[in-house]
């Protein structure tokens, strides 16, 4: 669902995109580093201000030529895997939108999140909310995790599993329902959606 950062759309409407970020996919059995597609992520909050006018214009133009269309990676309407521009590896990404943990909450649980710029970390800081943290994907393979005492590993595993598999289910469903119905009602085209990989239960 992405557009190139060199596209006319990104040049004309830079406020509709997070040009400091890249869309991709989290690691899986086929890509242990995840995927980095290079597209800027959407600034959905800004797009919502005019009722998703940019999207609706695209849909109306498509309807002049097609009766049906396929959304590849439809999960992007629920959430996207977002990687800060300095990084190439999907390991340093995070979900957007998301419900990160506050630094205070993590410190109260015995963790000391720190933005070192290194990839060997347990948490990555949210790029738009200072001192709010996302568990780093696949962090159980890091030296930082290996050095934790067993009780803190157990605490981290509980936090990690909740974050990636439960915490966002209702949140992401609500996120998609704010966008998709309004866009699909714009035209009479038949929509088909496809995705694979880490699919939340709410999709």
Where are the regions that the model predicts?
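Catalytic cores of glycan-processing enzymes that make or break glycosidic bonds
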Residues: 1-203
């Amino acid at each position: 669902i992405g557009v190139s950062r060199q596209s006319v759309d990104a040049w004309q409407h830079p406020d509709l995109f997070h040009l400091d970020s890249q869309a991709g996919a989290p690691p899986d059995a086929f890509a242990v580093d995840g995927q980095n597609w290079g597209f800027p992520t959407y600034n959905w909050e800004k797009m919502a201000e005019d009722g998703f006018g940019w999207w609706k214009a695209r849909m109306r133009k498509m309807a002049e030529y097609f009766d049906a269309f396929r959304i590849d990676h439809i999960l992007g309407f629920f959430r996207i895997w977002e990687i800060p521009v300095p990084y190439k590896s999907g390991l340093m990404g995070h979900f957007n939108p998301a419900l990160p943990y506050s630094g205070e909450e993590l410190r109260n649980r015995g963790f000391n999140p720190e933005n070192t710029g290194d990839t060997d970390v347990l948490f990555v800081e949210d790029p738009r909310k200072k001192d709010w943290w996302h568990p780093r994907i696949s962090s159980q393979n890091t030296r930082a995790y290996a050095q934790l005492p067993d009780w803190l590993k157990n605490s981290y595993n509980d936090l990690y599993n909740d974050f990636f598999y439960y915490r966002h289910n209702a949140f992401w469903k609500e996120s998609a329902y704010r966008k998709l119905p309004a866009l699909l009602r714009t035209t009479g085209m038949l929509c088909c959606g496809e995705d694979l990989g880490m699919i939340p239960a709410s999709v």
